[in-house]
């Protein structure tokens, strides 16, 4: 496990995202939970973003902590997410987590898949 403690994280876990995750963890009543962000094959552009709650920190995980909430990213996914923003939006389109990834060459219309 690598824990990021520098002032500028390689992945920006936004204030809005960390506070929403904190709220969801409190609703679950399990403070051992973290938000895992990972990349899988699929989607209309080749790669897809995925989110899951996890209470296990794996050896190759990058851990970014904000507002007492941990964001976990495995080493394979990390290479595609360096420089990205993990954010939470609540607007007229709905409420959802979103990733803004400067490494993505193309993204699909819904924003959940990308290519590099």
UniProtKB/Swiss-Prot annotation:
Cofactor annotation comment: Binds 1 iron-sulfur cluster per subunit.
Binding positions for iron-sulfur cluster per the UniProt entry: 44, 108, 110
Domain of life: Bacteria
Any Pfam family the entry gives: Fe-S_biosyn
Iron listed as a keyword: yes
Cofactor(s) the protein needs: iron-sulfur cluster
Keywords: Iron, Iron-sulfur, Metal-binding
GO biological process: iron-sulfur cluster assembly
GO molecular function: 2 iron, 2 sulfur cluster binding; 4 iron, 4 sulfur cluster binding; iron ion binding
Gene3D superfamilies per record: HesB-like domain (2.60.300.12)
Function description: Required for insertion of 4Fe-4S clusters for at least IspG.
Assembly behavior: Homodimer.
Similarity comment: family membership: Belongs to the HesB/IscA family.
NCBIfam families, A to Z: iron-sulfur cluster assembly accessory protein, PRK13623.1
The protein's name in its UniProt record: Iron-sulfur cluster insertion protein ErpA
Organism: Francisella tularensis subsp. holarctica (strain LVS)
């Amino acid at each position: 496990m690598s824990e990021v403690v520098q002032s500028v994280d390689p992945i920006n876990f936004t204030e809005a995202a960390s506070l929403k995750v904190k709220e969801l963890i409190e609703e679950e009543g399990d403070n051992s939970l973290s938000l895992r962000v990972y990349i899988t094959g699929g989607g209309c552009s080749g790669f897809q973003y995925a989110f899951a709650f996890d209470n296990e920190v794996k050896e190759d995980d990058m851990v970014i902590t904000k507002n007492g909430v941990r964001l976990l990213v495995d080493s394979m996914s990390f290479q595609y997410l360096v420089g990205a923003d993990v954010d939470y939006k609540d607007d007229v389109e709905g409420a959802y987590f979103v990733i803004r990834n400067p490494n993505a060459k193309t993204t699909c219309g819904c924003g959940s898949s990308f290519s590099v």
